[in-house]
Amino acid sequence: MIKCLFKILEGIILYLYEFIQLFINVFFSPLPPTKDSPRIGHVAVIGAGITGISTAAHLRSHGFEVTIFDESPDIGGIWRRVNSTSNLQINSLFYRFHPLAFYRSFYPFRDEILAQQHKVLTTYGLDKCIRFNTRVTKIERHS
């Protein structure tokens, strides 16, 4: 009987967890740009990890043209380099790199985190704006 109640409670908690994520996604995700969206400027983002992708997505949604530079051959930053059994040590509601990210568990593993990075990347059209295997050694401002 108690085991059954815990199972029901667990289901309710997971449902609420997914509802909260959906709420965050719908109300806080910036809209992806349209093809006709005016561009205000061009910004270089260094690194295609969680912070770089999140920053680039927000910049794109606010009208900036973006180029992402990363010295690695793929996105993911630290999460790409850790082993596949690594997972979050905190609840994923507190580890939201972008409102669009949607996790199926409280403590997602590396592959789910990388999948969410790819989702943000493609949703905002950033997959066409990345220069992989490119090390940034100098920065100059262009007018």
Predicted regions and their residues:
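Extreme N-terminal leader/targeting segments of oxidoreductases
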Residues: 1-42
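Eukaryotic beta-rich interaction modules
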Residues: 25-28, 58, 115, 130-132
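Intrinsically disordered, low-complexity regulatory regions enriched in Ser/Pro/Gly/Thr
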Residues: 36-39, 58-62, 88-89, 130, ...
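N-terminal Rossmann-like FAD-binding beta1-loop-alpha1 element of flavoenzymes
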Residues: 41-69
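Glycine-rich active-site loop/strand segments that organize a redox cofactor
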Residues: 71-119
